[in-house]
Each structure stands twice: as C-alpha cells, then as structure tokens.
Amino acid sequence: MDEHVPLDAETKAAEKPEDHRDELRLWLRLLTCTTLIEGEVRKRLRARFGVTLPRFDLMAELDKAPEGLTLSDLSKRMMVSNGNLTALVERLVATGHLARRTSDTDRRAQVVSLTGLGRAEFRAMAKEHERWIGEMFGELSRREVEELLRLLARAEASAGGAVNGARS
C-alpha cells in the first residue's frame, strides 16, 4: 500500500531544486529548524512548568531589565502588539509574578518588572530551557556551533539590509 507522507516545505523544495533558488531552500531550512525547536520548547515548558512560550519570553525580557520595561518597550522587544501583551501582563500581575508601576518619566506609561517570585520561577525555567537547547544542538561540535553563529550573523545582517532598504 502506497502511503502518502506529508513533506515539509524544505523537502519539497529539494525534490525540484531547479524550481527554487538556494536562498529559498536556506530560508526553508531555517524555518524548519525554528519550527521544530520552538514546538518542542513549547511542549516542554507546558509539561514541566505549566507555562506558555509567550509567558517565558516575557519573563526573559524582564529578567534582562531589572528596573522594568514599559509595555511599549516590551512589545517592541517581543515583536508583538501591546494588545497581545496586556492580557498576559495582567495575568502575571494577578499571580504575583510581575509588579506594575507608573513610569517616573511619563505618567501615561506603565512599567512592569519581575517580582522576587517571578524572577525565581523564571530562573528555574531558564536553567531547564538552556539544558533543552543544549540537548537539541548536542550533535553539533563546538566548532560547528561557532561557524553557524558566524554564518547566521551574516545572514541576519544581509536580511536586515534588505528589509531596511539598503538593497533592492
């Protein structure tokens, strides 16, 4: 019996390489890796800590800014709308993980920061997260990781140049 196995976009592109530029195949490979890793991280965060990836990401941003961040700054850093962020912040304030105060420089803006409870819980999650990521890239040598970091920095600069209009 011939079973149809669904393919990811990268595999489809490889089947007819004449139909795709190498840059497209590269983008699809990056997307496949990101989707695979992000899905596993989401699953593990939910199973181990009962939290979502957006909650983890928000707490990570605030852990890097002990003085706190405005909702506007948080939404820029996380690349989400203020509306998406507001409900999550409200839930974390209600559970005691975040504190909210009025900005000293702009009375219209609210600044949120991790509480002691929030910071302790985030750091426990971050430790596990780091271990998981290490496990997922565990078959790469130190040299391969360094080379990928170098190449991805160049890819980011190239994409940034194109996005920001430096090239057409």
Language model features: what each stretch is:
Residues 23, 27-45, 122-141, 145-159:
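Hydrophobic alpha-helical core bundles mediating ligand binding, dimerization, or RNAP-core interactions
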Residues 23, 73, 105-107:
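Short, solvent-exposed coil/turn segments
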Residues 35, 39-81, 95, 164-168:
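N-terminal helix-turn-helix DNA-binding core of bacterial DNA-binding proteins
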Residues 2-6, 12-14, 90-150:
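Charged, amphipathic alpha-helical coiled-coil/dimerization segments
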Residues 47, 64, 80, 99, ...:
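Conserved amphipathic alpha-helical interaction elements at protein-protein interfaces in regulatory
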Residues 1-49, 168:
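N-terminal leader segment of winged-helix/HTH proteins
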